[in-house]
């Protein structure tokens, strides 16, 4: 038996959730057991820049970008499951990290 862990990351949580729903439906159609999606903590990255190129250091502007992520575990993955995952057409802004683990 093989266990597959999918970690999905995106800047937009709506696009991420649509991709998660597509993956869950494909895995359930192939007959594998699934755990998740587990929402992971949102990571925020802040950038502070000066508004003026020359003076007024007190005048600054802050920008923030948020990283949303979900975790999906596929228990007892079959070759049909892997084929259905490879054929999925996910949004280009979703980053998918796949980890394969052997279970006893």
From Swiss-Prot:
InterPro entries, per the entry: Ribosomal_uS10, Ribosomal_uS10_CS, Ribosomal_uS10_dom, Ribosomal_uS10_dom_sf
Keyword S-adenosyl-L-methionine among UniProt keywords: no
Signal peptide extent: none
GO molecular function terms listed in the Swiss-Prot or TrEMBL record: structural constituent of ribosome; tRNA binding
TM region positions: none
Annotated PROSITE patterns: RIBOSOMAL_S10
One Gene Ontology cellular component annotation held by this UniProt entry: ribonucleoprotein complex
Biological processes annotated in GO: translation
Key words, A-Z: Ribonucleoprotein, Ribosomal protein
Gene3D superfamilies for the chain: Ribosomal protein S10 domain
Pfam families reported for this sequence: Ribosomal_S10
Keyword match Ribosomal protein: yes
SMART domains per the UniProt record, alphabetical: Ribosomal_S10
Subunit structure, as described in the record: Part of the 30S ribosomal subunit.
Function: Involved in the binding of tRNA to the ribosomes.
Recorded family membership: Belongs to the universal ribosomal protein uS10 family.
Protein name: Small ribosomal subunit protein uS10
């Amino acid at each position: 038996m093989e266990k597959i862990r999918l970690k999905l990351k995106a800047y937009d949580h709506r696009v991420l959730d649509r991709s998660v729903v597509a993956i869950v439906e494909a895995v359930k159609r192939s007959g594998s057991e699934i755990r998740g999606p587990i929402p992971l903590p949102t990571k925020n990255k802040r950038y502070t820049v000066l508004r003026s190129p020359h003076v007024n250091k007190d005048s600054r502007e802050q920008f923030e970008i948020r990283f949303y992520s979900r975790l999906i575990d596929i228990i007892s993955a079959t070759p049909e499951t892997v084929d259905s995952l490879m054929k999925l057409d996910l949004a280009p802004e979703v980053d998918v990290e796949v980890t394969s683990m052997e279970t006893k």
